[in-house]
Amino acid sequence: MEHHEDNAQLDNYLQNRLAESLQICGGAGEHNPHLADATGGNGCAPGIAPSKSDEVDGEEDEEWKYIHEVRQSEKLQQEKLPLTKETGNGFGPGRDSDNQVHGNGAAAVFNLYEEDVEVIKNDGDFSTNSNTTTSTDEVVARQAQEPNQLPEQLQQQQQIESQGVHEDPRQEDEDEHSSVATTYGTSSLSENNSSPLDQEEVVMVAQTVGQEQLVDFDNKENSYFVKNLEENHSQLNPNAVAFVPGVGSQSSSPLPAAEDPLPGVQPRPFLPGGTLDDLVAESPRKEFARINMDGIAVPDEREFDIEADMRPHELEQESDTFGAGHLEMQLLNGIGTADQAALRDVLDHGPETSVDMELPLDQVPNDADIMKQSIYAEHNSSIEDILNSVQPLPIQTCDDKELIHVEEKEHVSKSPSTEELQFQSDFPNNQESHTLFNNTEQDPMQASFYLEHTSQKAQEGCQEQMQLPAECSDIFADQSLLLDTSAPQLSSEADSPVAKLELESQQAGIVDITPSPLSSTAEKHLVEDTKELVEEYTLDPESHFFGVVSSQAPLQLFGKHTLPSIIHSCKHRVASEQNDEENAVFESVSGYETQNFDEISSPPEGINPFAQPFTPAHLVIEQANTMMEDVGGMPIPASEDFAICDKVASKSSNEVEDHRSEQQAFVKEELLHPVGDVVAQVENLGTEKNFVVEEERLPISVSDEIPLSSASKEKLLPDTTDEQLLTSALEEKLRSVAPEESVSTAADGQSISQFDEYVIASNKPLEDILEPEKDVEVAKSLSEKTSVATVAGGAVVGATKTHSATKAGSTAASAKSKTETLVMKKTTASSTSVYGANKSAAPRPSTARLGIKSTSIATKTSTTSSLTGNPRKSLSSNVGSTVKPPTKLSGTRPATAPVSKVTLGAKTITNKPTASGTASDNVTRTTLRPLVSTNARRPATSGTGSVASSTARRPVTNAKGSAPGSAASTKVRPAATMTAPVKPKVLSPRSTISSTTTVRKVPSTSTPSFSTRSPNKQQSNGLGKNTSSTTTSTATATITKSFTARSAPKFTHSASLTYNNGSTSRRLLVPGSSSTTTTSSLRKSSPLKAAPGKAASKPLTPQSKDGTAKSSPAVLKARNSTLMGGEGVAPSNECVPTPNGQINAEEVVKLKGKGLAEEVKIIEEQKLHEQDVPAHNAEVPLLDF
């Protein structure tokens, strides 16, 4: 670099001196002798060079200055940097054979060729200066001379370095003389030319314009050589030579070596550009472009304006607004009035185009320019239309669909309904085929769940003709608001199939997204139609003659199924069942129910006793035979049940309708939470109100069409099939208890307390009847639930609930009908506690609606409550002291979990009587949590977690709410918080339970033994039975609703589904204390939803902090009931636990606006009922998680 710097300085001096010397020398001839001497035998070249130099000295003087300076720099570089040897141009193909030999140490091979190259270089330099100095002849001479010149050139270079300016004349002559030899194109990169000054001078002297041209030719030769090394640089350099004058142009010139950049840079400053670093960096053509730009005369503003005025079409229209208007024209082409001009301007941008623009501007009227306008304008306009219209459409469509689906998911995905929807989409063809086979009753299925609007209209007409009053559409309209997920499914028409219980059941699967509207309408219709159904039920005994068939036959009868249609459906069910149990169930029970039922059906298969009951065909046939064997002439009890239902319907049809509105709102709130069963329970809320009315008769004979009516009403949503089958199977056994049940139902219709007692009493018979079956079912359901729980927390909940729902569906269907009748009567009793319990029950139904499977489980839970009623009485007493069940919670839901297990197995039945008998209010509060726990937990957590969840809530209920209405409601949320730990049950179906149990142990240590109890295991185990039975005794009836909703939680965590009522709220509260986060999270989300009432949310959270505050869902619902009693909606929110605890409260508010107050009242009553049925709730926690 020092050499480069020195060379740069010397080059500056030399450039100035050489410019003067060249001018003075005029002729290179004088110097040529010196060059010849210096070259030592360059005589030929000097002779050639002088002649050429003489020819064009004037021209060369200018070029010579540049070339000489370049060569001086090269010489300096060569001498000082022999190794660097022409880093710039000289670095190329042997610029100076000397330099290559010396500096670069280039192989001798290059020396001769390099000499030629050097000649060419020098010529290139000159040529760049427009000096055609060297010819091929000169190059040849130079080649001959260079071998001798190399040492002389080195000497000359050294002398030049020492003499500096004094050498200039000699150098000039030498350069001129050697110009032929040195004209090698690399000299064009003279910056780096390492050729001796003598050679450079000779070349410069000799270079003429013609010579430069020849040099260019030589440069081509050099280019060939450069291809070896430097030609790439020299090739660039020939153009760069113009820029070479830039002193700092080294970097700009492509120098393979950085050795000569400075010398190359020095010559470049001579370029007009001054320092050519920038110019050199740019391509020489660019510089020419700059020159052209500079050459372009820019008119003054005034002149330009004048010119513009002369061409208004160009400038005013186009040029003046060149950027804006023209751009628009360019983009839009033909959009603007000045489109033609704009097109022209667009085509002609820049000074050249502007120049050309004048002519085209005259031709501007030629809009016919196909290139400019027609093509662009047409394409652009069409594209714009397409883009503007098409893009927004897909986006909007996607957004709308996404919003719809998102809402559906928000509401339904929390429950099995989304999966059920998938099932519906999978089974709609089957459903349609069933509809073709089964009559218009299945038309809603034909229409597909998306719409039961189209088919529902026809169905609506049929239903109106048959049993459903026009009120269905009105109710449905109210419910459609409740059902945010699928408004179309919410259509009253969809609900109108409620009269067609099978259609409702089938539709239940379809309406999973819209569980509450269908269920609400179905409930009202069930209430109103209960009498009609009972009246038609006289027809049912024929269909009821089929026993189990009657279980779903009542649905058909209710759905205007005549005995032939029922028989046909039964046959179809049998055939389909033979083909596919799920398909058969869907077909026979209801095309719509098929989807939800399919969802439920696979889990029911796990519960073999109920798996067949789940499949309507098996239920109809097998249970018909079984019931005929077990119950004997139970079809008569079915008619008795219908008579009871008539009484109850007449008595509580208003109450039931109120409960329905309440439950509908609650269900709609919980629509989001449970999936399959919840949807069914949307109807089931109302249906369960009727179901309470009907279940009074239902327990008498589930297989009777009463169970089907109540079950299908519950199942009008997807859960119908499970509950119908379960209800029929369980109620067949219940029919043995039927007298008892009828009495209890009648008494319950009359008084709430009697209803509780009857529920307990009836539940005991249920327990007795169902316990063996439940034990078997528990084994299957436990195995299934265990596997299902292992498979997925939510899926397990759904599957387990499906099985549980199937088992408990029948049992709980009857029990629920009993319990719910009781609940309704409690509500009628207008007890605040009972009303709160009913509200709790209502949220559960909402959950049940959301999850059809949950509904089935709820039904199962109801049955379980009946069976476990006595044990639950002890828990019920514990519920009276909420702390005690929480103490059991130290076992982490032991009390609740056993109930859940009991729900899965016969134990549930055992728990139910106890809970019912013990304290309907406390039990109801307790039940709310167990309900959720049993539904979601039991499937999700093998038993321990769900039990803990249930226990935690129930203890809270017991501890918090001796007064089920207010205290229970306040405690409900703490229970939910306490219950949150239960959520882990869903996370780990079996294993999580222990951790969950541990968490629950913290809230309540009273049930530590049940901590290990898995929801399924505990059913078989008596462990959860006794401890949790008391807690869940009252909850059992409520569980029928919410559990049905929660039964289908496809989510691994049924927590959201289970949270339908206070139970979910409790879980929400539990999460803080919960050892398992996932379950807690699920509960958290569901409790908010589960808390339809705002008050419920506030009380729940504070009490969740209370370790013992984990009141069972019943407690939460009891408090909610109190709130609900004051404000129907508030308890509903609390009672409606959803996967998102927050959503339910919001939904309740939404429901309020659309006449939800009524539904809220119903929900409150149901909460009271649920509180009255703690056994189911206690069981539900196991099912939940």
UniProtKB/Swiss-Prot annotation:
Signal peptide: none annotated. Its main location: cytoplasm. Keywords: Cytoplasm, Cytoskeleton, Microtubule, Phosphoprotein. GO terms for biological process: centrosome cycle; mitotic cell cycle. The modification Phosphoserine is found at residues 354, 448, 709-710, 712, 728, 874, 1075, 1086, 1121. It is found in: Cytoplasm, Cytoskeleton; Cytoplasm, Cytoskeleton, Spindle. Residues 146-159, 856-866, 940-952, 1003-1015 have a biased composition (Low complexity). Residues 179-196, 867-881, 908-936, 989-999, 1016-1026, 1054-1066, 1100-1111 have a biased composition (Polar residues). Residues 146-196, 856-1035, 1054-1114 are annotated as: Disordered. The modification Phosphothreonine is found at residue 721. Residues 745-977 are annotated as: Microtubule-binding. Phosphorylation of various serine residues may play a regulatory role. The basic domain contains numerous sequences that match known consensus sequences of several different protein kinases. May play an important role in the regulation of microtubule assembly and interaction. This is 205 kDa microtubule-associated protein. It comes from Drosophila melanogaster. The gene is Map205.
